[in-house]
């Protein structure tokens, strides 16, 4: 078929912002705020892949802000996306305070707590991270995407990490992780 012969249908999807609490900041973030108040924030259109999250990717060359929201939580977001993220999350951007601006490369190999399980997600740098949409912090589940798999394997091959590749969904689209076991992946979006 020629491109002109293909009709695309809009497929509405669930989107989600997810906070990952910083666990190990390599001593770089605590001068600005207490560690228990700092979060990497990702945005995803595939919440059902969150159980497979093993990393968060940032772009080493981008500017990221530590944005303190009303209430005291501090969010790590790409500087160029911060205002849009606040608007989408119903946070008054004008009431927020930028505590610091850092290059994405400064976050490399920090860790954040997984939002659903007692394990860490490591922070990696990848050129596939863009400023087109989202937060500038990309949810990375190596069992669910080529970019995710390739960046995790590259870090493993370089001896920098030892990232697993969980695939908590079987060939029929049914969740296999015990917490969501038996649910069809699209239904798991609502629970996750």
Regions found by a protein language model. Give the residues of each.
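Non-cofactor substrate-recognition interfaces
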Residues: 29-41, 47-192
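Active-site cores that bind ATP or allylic diphosphates and position pyrophosphate for catalysis
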Residues: 1-41, 49-50
């Amino acid at each position: 078929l020629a491109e002109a012969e293909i009709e695309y249908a809009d497929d509405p999807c669930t989107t989600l912002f997810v906070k990952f609490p910083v666990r190990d900041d390599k001593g770089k973030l605590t001068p600005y705020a207490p560690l228990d108040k700092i979060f990497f924030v990702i945005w995803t259109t595939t919440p059902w892949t969150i159980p497979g999250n093993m990393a968060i990717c940032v772009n080493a060359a981008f500017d990221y802000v530590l944005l303190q929201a009303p209430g005291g939580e501090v969010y790590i977001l790409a500087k160029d996306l911060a205002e849009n993220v606040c608007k989408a999350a119903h946070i008054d951007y004008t009431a927020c305070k930028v505590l610091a601006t850092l290059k994405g490369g400064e976050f490399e190999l920090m860790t954040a707590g997984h939002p659903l399980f007692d394990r860490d997600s490591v922070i990696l740098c990848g050129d596939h991270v863009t400023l087109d949409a989202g937060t500038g912090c990309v949810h990375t589940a190596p069992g669910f995407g080529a970019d995710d798999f390739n960046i995790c394997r590259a870090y493993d091959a370089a001896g920098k990490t030892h990232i697993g590749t969980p695939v908590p969904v079987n060939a029929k689209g049914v969740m296999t992780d015990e917490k969501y076991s038996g649910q069809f992946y699209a239904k798991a979006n609502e629970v996750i």
